[in-house]
């Protein structure tokens, strides 16, 4: 059931509700009054993000914020999973402009403040990295389709190309030019029907807050049925194209990384199995689900395709 507009919870009230549940009983028992509890809630700085909370119909248990924000791939900063937390302080997510162009009738340049005005909702999604680890994250954002509908794709548009900001003053690896870990700027792409799918999200926040720098602030893509490298971070450009974009990892190694990158336990990476994954915080591995558990929703997009060839 889709929440009503009246169900939209301002971020500060959302936080207060969670804080009340966590602190209320203990505070009342310890002090015999609610005054200390109310004082504690007032110390929480309000956020401008308002969003529809997730109904979490799958009863997914999110990883902790510390796990999801402290273990990331962001090669513009480092190949280390933990170093971007500190190194990403050079990123300036505000002000920010998104240039949307290409095969559209209504090209636009949108500020991050304008993007915050889209109806935001919380989506609790599984996230599966091609490297074999996974997590569950409560993202905040809006369907990419909402932006694309505003742009009005032409009949020539078949793909959507995404590009990370190119600014060596903010991203250390971009200073290295041809010696960088990857060619810059980072590029990803989707077929137009994939981009228009209701699960495809442009995320501006997570865990009730704006995106941390190391998680791709201020704007990133989330495609939950694909491996994580498709979910490009710090997006500066969106372009609708006639031709399939050459995404960064396919450019680097087309034998190991394809354009589609659908999560598929039946198609191994050339150097490791994709049949299982390690959930962050767990010592044991779990079976990987086809399309990361979203097979019912997205399998029809690939009807008749050879998923071992088109990986």
Swiss-Prot record:
Cellular localization per UniProt: Periplasm
CDD domains: YedY_like_Moco (cd02107)
Residues in the signal sequence: 1-45
Co-factor binding details: Binds 1 Mo-molybdopterin (Mo-MPT) cofactor per subunit.
Enzyme class, spelled out: oxidoreductase
Cofactor: Mo-molybdopterin
GO biological process: protein repair
Record note on quaternary structure: Heterodimer of a catalytic subunit (MsrP) and a heme-binding subunit (MsrQ).
Protein name in the entry: Protein-methionine-sulfoxide reductase catalytic subunit MsrP
GN (gene name): msrP
């Amino acid at each position: 059931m889709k929440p009503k507009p009246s169900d939209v919870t301002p971020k500060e009230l959302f936080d207060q509700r969670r804080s009340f549940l966590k602190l209320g009983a203990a505070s009342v028992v310890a002090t015999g009054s609610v005054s200390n509890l109310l004082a504690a809630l007032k110390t929480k700085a309000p956020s401008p993000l308002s969003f529809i909370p997730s109904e979490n119909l799958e009863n997914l248990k999110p990883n902790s914020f510390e796990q999801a924000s402290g273990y990331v791939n962001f090669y513009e900063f480092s190949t280390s999973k933990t170093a971007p937390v500190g190194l990403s302080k050079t990123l300036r997510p505000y002000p920010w402009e998104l240039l949307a162009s290409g095969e559209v009738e209504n090209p636009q340049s949108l500020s991050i403040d304008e993007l915050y005005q889209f109806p935001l909702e919380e989506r609790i999604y599984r996230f599966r990295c091609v490297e074999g680890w996974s997590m569950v994250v409560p993202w905040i954002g809006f369907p990419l389709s909402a932006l694309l509908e505003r742009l009005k794709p032409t009949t020539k548009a078949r793909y959507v190309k995404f590009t990370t900001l190119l600014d060596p003053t903010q991203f250390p690896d971009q200073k290295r030019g041809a010696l960088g870990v990857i060619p810059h700027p980072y590029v990803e792409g989707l077929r137009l029907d994939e981009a228009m799918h209701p699960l495809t999200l442009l995320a501006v926040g997570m865990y009730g807050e704006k995106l941390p720098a190391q998680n791709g602030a201020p704007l990133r893509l989330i495609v939950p049925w694909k491996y994580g490298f498709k979910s490009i971070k710090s997006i500066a450009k969106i372009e609708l194209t006639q031709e399939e974009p050459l995404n960064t990892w396919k450019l680097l190694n087309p034998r190991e990384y394809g354009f589609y990158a659908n999560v598929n336990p039946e198609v191994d990476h050339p150097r490791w199995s994709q049949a299982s994954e390690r959930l962050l915080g767990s010592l044991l591995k779990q079976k990987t689900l086809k399309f990361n558990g979203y097979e019912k929703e997205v399998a029809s997009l690939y009807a008749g395709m050879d998923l071992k060839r088109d990986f």
